[in-house]
Amino acid sequence: MGKLYIFDTTLRDGEQTPGVNLNKEEKLEIAKQLAKLNVDIIEAGFPIASPGEFEAVKNIAEKVKGPIIAALARAIPMDIDRAWEAIKYSESPRIHTFIATSDIHIEKKLKKTRDEVLEQAVSAVKYAKRYCSDVEFSAEDAVRSDFNFLVKIFEAVIEAGATVINVPDTVGYALPWEFGELIRRLKENIRNIDKARVSVHCHNDLGLATANSLSAIVNGAEQVECTVNGLGERAGNAAMEEIVMAIKVRRLPFEVSIKTEEIYKTSKLVSNLTGIPIQPNKAIVGENAFAHESGIHQHGVIQDPSTYEIIDPKTIGIPESKIVLGKHSGKHAFEKRLQELGYSLPPDQLEEAFRRFKELADKKKEITDKDIEALVSNQIRIIPEYYKLRHLQVVSGIGIVPTATIIISENGEEIKTVEIGNGPVDAVYKAITKAVKVPHSLEDFSLKSVTGGTDALGEAMVKLSDKDGNIYVGRATSTDVIEASALAYLRALNQLVMLKGKD
C-alpha cells in the first residue's frame, strides 16, 4: 500500500477565494486544526505578497508542529529569499517555487521563450536548495503545456534538486481520463522520476477537481494538493474531505494519514473563519449530506443506516451531543463542547467567550452549536479596536424617518453623530461613516439568521474596499440585527485601519 501525501493549501490557494481575508490569528487557528487533522504538508501562504502575509506564515512556521510547512515563491530569488525567511524556523520547511510552462502563459504573460523558462526554473530550484533540502517545483498550467517540454523541464528541475514535481490543472480544463493518462505518461517518460515525488493540484472549473485528483492518484501521483471545503480561486480546488473519504470508503490501496474524525471540525472552523458557508448539499460535510426526506429512505435508515448511508457520520467527527447548553451550563461543559467543535482557546479567550455565551444564554432558552460557532469565530478574529461602539440608538417605523444616533470612541475621545437613512441599517452606516473619516467604499452587506426562532442570533457581514481595491471583511453576531450590522461595519473599518492606516 503506497503512501499518499496530503498537501493542504487552504491557507494559500484557499484564501484566494473572493471575499476571504484571514488575519494572522485566524490563519494560526486553522493551521493548528490542520495539524490535528494530520495533513502531511501545510502550505501556509505566499510570503512575498505582503508584510502581513509574511508574518502569518512565519507565525505558523514557528508555532505549528508536525506537518511540513511550505511557502510559495515565484521562480525569482527575491521571492525565494522571502519564503525562506518566513519558514526557516519550522521543524520541516519546504520552499514551493513555480513558473508557467504552457505556451499561452509563456508568450502572453511571461513574454519569454521556452528556453528562458527552463533556465529560470532550474536556477530557482538551485537557489532554493541553498536554503532548504525540500524543494517543490510546480509547472503552472501543466495540462495545457506541450508534453515534451513538460518532460524536459521536470527532468531538469529534478536534476537541480527538486524533491517534488507538481502537475497543476491550473484552469480546471482536464477530464479525468486525460489527467490520469498525463500522470502515467509523465512517470513513464521522465528518466529521473525516481528521485522526486509526483504531485497534482486540480481546480474545479468544470466540477471535476476531485475526480481528476483521484484519477491522477490511481495513475501514480504520490501527493495531492487540496483545500478544506474545496475553497480556492474561481470555482475552487479539489476538496480534501472528498478525496480522503473516497479513498477510505472505496478502500483504495493508498495509505492516508488523515484523522477522519477531525474532518467535520476542520470544515466548520474553516467555514466560520473565512465566512464562506458550506453549501447544504456539499459532499461529506454539507448540512444535508446525512439528511433523508424521502419516506422510503427514512424507513431504510431507521432499519439500518447502511441502506442509504455509505459513511457513518461518526467517522468524520459529526458530534452526537447529548448535552443541551443554556444559562445554567458551566464553563467545563462549554469548553468541552468547544473542543468537540474543533476550537481550542487560550484561557483569556475562553473566559471572554464564556462571558459572551452567558450573555447570550440570558436572551435565548437553548444555545445551539451554530450559536457557539458564531460566538467563538468572532472571538478568534482579534483586530485592534481603533474605533469602538459605545452607544447606538435607532428610531424607525411606519411614517417615521429612520434616524440613528451613535457614539464611537477613538483613542479615548468620544465622537457623536446623528444621521437619517433609507432604513435603520442605512442610517447607522451613514452615521458611522460620518464619525469615522476613513476613505472606503461599501462593496457588500448581508444579514442572515444563524439559527431558527425569533430569538436567533443574526450574523452581519460587511465588505469594504480601499482606494487600491483591497477588500476588508467584517462580521458580527447579535440577537439585535442592527447592533450586529453596526459592529460588522466597524470591524471591517478597524481591519482597514490596521492594515492600511487612515489615509
Swiss-Prot record:
* SUPFAM superfamilies cross-referenced by the UniProt entry: 2-isopropylmalate synthase LeuA, allosteric (dimerisation) domain, Aldolase
Q: Which chemical reaction does it catalyze?
A: 3-methyl-2-oxobutanoate + acetyl-CoA + H2O = (2S)-2-isopropylmalate + CoA + H(+)
| InterPro entries given in the database record | 2-IPM_HCS-like (IPR050073), 2-isopropylmalate_synth_dimer (IPR013709), AIPM/Hcit_synth_CS (IPR002034), Aldolase_TIM (IPR013785), LeuA/HCS_post-cat (IPR054691), LeuA_allosteric_dom_sf (IPR036230), LeuA_bact_synth (IPR005671), PYR_CT (IPR000891)
According to its UniProt entry, the protein's GO biological process terms are: L-leucine biosynthetic process
According to its UniProt record, in which pathway does this protein act?
Amino-acid biosynthesis; L-leucine biosynthesis; L-leucine from 3-methyl-2-oxobutanoate: step 1/4
Which cofactors does this gene product need? Mn(2+)
Q: Which Pfam families match?
A: HCS_D2, HMGL-like, LeuA_dimer
Q: Could you tell me the EC number(s) of this protein?
A: 2.3.3.13
Q: Where is the Pyruvate carboxyltransferase domain?
A: 4-264
- Where does it live in the cell? Cytoplasm
Binding residues for Mn(2+), per the UniProt record?
D13, H201, H203, N237
Q: Give the family from UniProt.
A: Belongs to the alpha-IPM synthase/homocitrate synthase family. LeuA type 1 subfamily.
| PANTHER family named in the record | 2-ISOPROPYLMALATE SYNTHASE 1, CHLOROPLASTIC-RELATED (PTHR10277:SF9), HOMOCITRATE SYNTHASE-RELATED (PTHR10277)
- The protein's assembly and partners: Homodimer.
Protein name (record): 2-isopropylmalate synthase
Organism the protein comes from: Dictyoglomus turgidum (strain DSM 6724 / Z-1310)
Lineage of the organism: Bacteria, Pseudomonadati, Dictyoglomota, Dictyoglomia, Dictyoglomales
Q: Gene name? A: leuA
